[in-house]
Amino acid sequence: MENAKMNSLIAQYPLVEDLVALKETTWFNPGTTSLAEGLPYVGLTEQDVQDAHARLSRFAPYLAKAFPETAAAGGIIESELVAIPAMQKRLEKEYQQPIAGQLLLKKDSHLPISGSIKARGGIYEVLAHAEKLALEAGLLTLEDDYSKLLSPEFKQFFSQYSIAVGSTGNLGLSIGIMSARIGFKVTVHMSADARAWKKAKLRSHGVTVVEYEQDYGVAVEEGRKAAQSDPNCFFIDDENSRTLFLGYSVAGQRLKAQFAQQGRIVDADNPLFVYLPCGVGGGPGGVAFGLKLAFGDHVHCFFAEPTHSPCMLLGVHTGLHDQISVQDIGIDNLTAADGLAVGRASGFVGRAMERLLDGFYTLSDQTMYDMLGWLAQEEGIRLEPSALAGMAGSQRVCASVSYQQMHGFSAEQLRNATHLVWATGGGMVPEEEMNQYLAKGR
């Protein structure tokens, strides 16, 4: 971006200067509305989420047999919700900032099949596509036991079709593993940030991995192009897919059930704050949408991004969405948080969700490494750097009197609050790699 344009952008949005300087930044969204007001802009409804829920239930018998690690849960792909009191104390000590309320961790990092939040959306979209093809071919009815999809006849049928996706790693992992198991031919277009072990794991499942020297945006674009030339190839579009988004959104009702099981209350007197790591935006956007439908105006969602890849904060704050990238303002999009290394946010997610998000913040790679180490020491839970992005959120909220006043939170409401950190990945990181992460923490 030329200097004059840049200066006028900074004049209009002074916060951009902090982003350019790679400062850890917090922006509380003044445009937040009620659910009733914000919902029409999403373009999806509660019924759409119920349909996704029903589809996953139809596939449960299949998943239980195809992936034995899901059998105990009856073929439902869901993660644990745990309290992390020792980590809460550690954060208070390190930052000299009390955290009012209770700190919890949602362990999507340990979801079965692919060990990340992408096991929600990625697997769901592959299943939705497989179901559509099988129904259209007259091989399946909605009343069938879907475990019949494991038969050689279905494998043969699906092998005529292929799936393509562009990814920094975790989405490719979930879509690759699921597609290969069903019988699709699958190609994952991986950006320069993708970890070697993720590529190796995909190849071990018979997935074709195409590697790029450039970032995520290029991998997605090339994947899209390759798919266009083949009528039997289905491209899963991380930037614009409503199906992916709905796969993530099912998490809202599931979390509500987990809260009920644990006797946790969410209402006006007991607010819920949720901190979601954000790359292109589909995962956190879909989850936040589901949470809003489940908990209404009593849940407050925040997106967390690396200082080197603040694409969603930049897009929503300036109102330019996918018309601006972090590279346009001179930021390099290079971060250890490979899952979040995205320079241009999803325009669909930004426009759909901007009224339903309470805020956005950035944190440095070093901060993620530090918290990764503390969590391993205090709670014995090991995550990848991206998954720690949400861990800084409770601090930012508890330290901001202006945010608390904007929403009229009393001291008592904050004492009764639940702070939920959404851990997005790390359950499948090889030990050697994990030890390298741990060595970087202070």
UniProtKB/Swiss-Prot annotation:
Q: Which residues carry this modification: N6-(pyridoxal phosphate)lysine?
A: 118
EC number of this enzyme: 4.3.1.18
The domain of life for this entry's organism is Bacteria
Which cofactor(s) are needed, names only?
pyridoxal 5'-phosphate
> InterPro entries attached here?
D_Ser_am_lyase (IPR011780), Ser/Thr_Dehydratase (IPR050147), Ser/Thr_deHydtase_PyrdxlP-BS (IPR000634), TrpB-like_PALP (IPR001926), TrpB-like_PALP_sf (IPR036052)
Locate the transmembrane regions by residue number: none
Q: Which GO terms describe its molecular function?
A: D-serine ammonia-lyase activity; hydro-lyase activity; pyridoxal phosphate binding
Query: What does the record say about the knockout?
Result: Initially shown to have a 5-6 hour lag phase when grown in human urine, bacteria are initially rounded and swollen but are close to wild-type in morphology by 24 hours and to be more competitive than wild-type in mouse infection. The wild-type (wt) control was later shown to have an amber mutation in rpoS; when the dsdA gene is disrupted in a strain wt for rpoS a growth defect in human urine, lack of growth on minimal medium with D-serine and no difference in growth in a mouse infection model was seen. Single deletion, grows on D-alanine but not D-serine or D-serine plus glycerol.
The UniProt entry's GO biological process terms, in alphabetical order, are: D-serine catabolic process; isoleucine biosynthetic process
State the reactions this protein catalyses: D-serine = pyruvate + NH4(+)
Ordered alphabetically, the record's keywords are:
Lyase, Pyridoxal phosphate
What other remark does the UniProt record contain for this protein?
A: E.coli CFT073, a uropathogenic strain (UPEC), was originally isolated from urine, which has a high concentration of D-serine. D-serine is toxic to bacteria. The ability to take up D-serine coupled with the activity of this enzyme may allow use of this amino acid as a carbon source in a sugar-poor environment.
Q: How does it assemble?
A: Monomer.
Q: Which family does it belong to?
A: Belongs to the serine/threonine dehydratase family. DsdA subfamily.
The record's annotation in PANTHER family points to:
D-SERINE DEHYDRATASE (PTHR48078:SF9), THREONINE DEHYDRATASE, MITOCHONDRIAL-RELATED (PTHR48078)
Protein name from the UniProt record:
D-serine dehydratase
Q: Which organism is it from?
A: Escherichia coli O6:H1 (strain CFT073 / ATCC 700928 / UPEC)
